[in-house]
């Protein structure tokens, strides 16, 4: 899907660590989130219409490309995320967006999830809808990945409690975007929200930062058995959730 969108100079924003092997039908059935959900939303928000085959063989043709369609009941959201229990999705109308023309990527050290939440609010206030990705990583994730995945290292070169990999972008050429990000991060560092930072200076450095994030599952497998989970929590509740969940895991 992403390649087809790129061929017509458009952008399909659903991006997953498993995007090299997953299929759009599975993404729809699980309502996958992805790395760009902070700006574009989860899979449900990227769909205009569906074609679905029910268990008795009937076909529901809802392949509309309209944002507003009052010709009947909108059953789309019943099937997205239902994991095939209500019917098999056989086709979909998907939303495409203008391709990002200017992208800035930063890898940041923060004290904890509370600081990360504060940083997200600041970046959103400074850039509007410019925050495309915002990934929180505990220290152990960076350590495991650097230890078990060839070609991956700690971008900051020294240990910190937690990290954020963030990206801001615009659909136009905007040479001022980097300065805006730098100014926001400088103020965050002055206020003690950000402890250290590195900004990608090239496409290769950007790819290296994202390789670290996307290689975390591979590092977990190499380190031994792990329990996979996918939990949705309101942003404001993340600090409390992390504190209670971490205590429960360590108990």
Identify what each model region corresponds to:
Residues 1-251:
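Noncatalytic alpha-helical scaffold of FAD-dependent oxidoreductases
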């Amino acid at each position: 899907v992403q390649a087809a969108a790129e061929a017509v100079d458009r952008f399909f924003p659903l991006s997953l660590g498993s995007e090299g092997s997953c299929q759009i039908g599975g993404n729809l059935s699980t309502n996958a989130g992805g790395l760009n959900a902070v700006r574009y939303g989860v899979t449900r928000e990227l769909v205009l219409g569906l074609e679905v085959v029910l268990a008795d063989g009937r076909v529901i043709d809802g392949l509309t490309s309209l944002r507003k369609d009052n010709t009947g009941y909108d059953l789309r959201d019943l099937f997205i995320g239902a994991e095939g229990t209500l019917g098999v999705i056989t086709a979909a109308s998907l939303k495409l967006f203008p391709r990002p023309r200017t992208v800035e990527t930063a890898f940041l050290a923060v004290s904890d999830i509370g600081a990360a939440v504060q940083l997200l609010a600041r970046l959103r206030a400074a850039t509007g809808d410019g925050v495309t990705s915002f990934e929180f990583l505990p220290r152990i994730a960076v350590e495991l990945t650097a230890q078990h995945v060839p070609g991956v290292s700690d971008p900051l070169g020294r240990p910190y409690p937690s990290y954020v990999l963030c990206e801001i972008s615009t659909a136009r050429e905007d040479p001022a975007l980097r300065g805006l990000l730098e100014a926001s991060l400088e103020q965050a560092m002055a206020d003690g929200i950000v402890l250290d930072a590195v900004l990608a200076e090239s496409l290769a450095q950007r790819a290296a930062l994202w390789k670290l994030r996307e290689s975390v599952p591979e590092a977990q497998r190499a380190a031994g058995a792990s329990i996979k989970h996918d939990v949705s929590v309101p942003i404001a509740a993340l600090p409390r959730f992390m504190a209670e969940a971490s205590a429960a895991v360590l108990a």
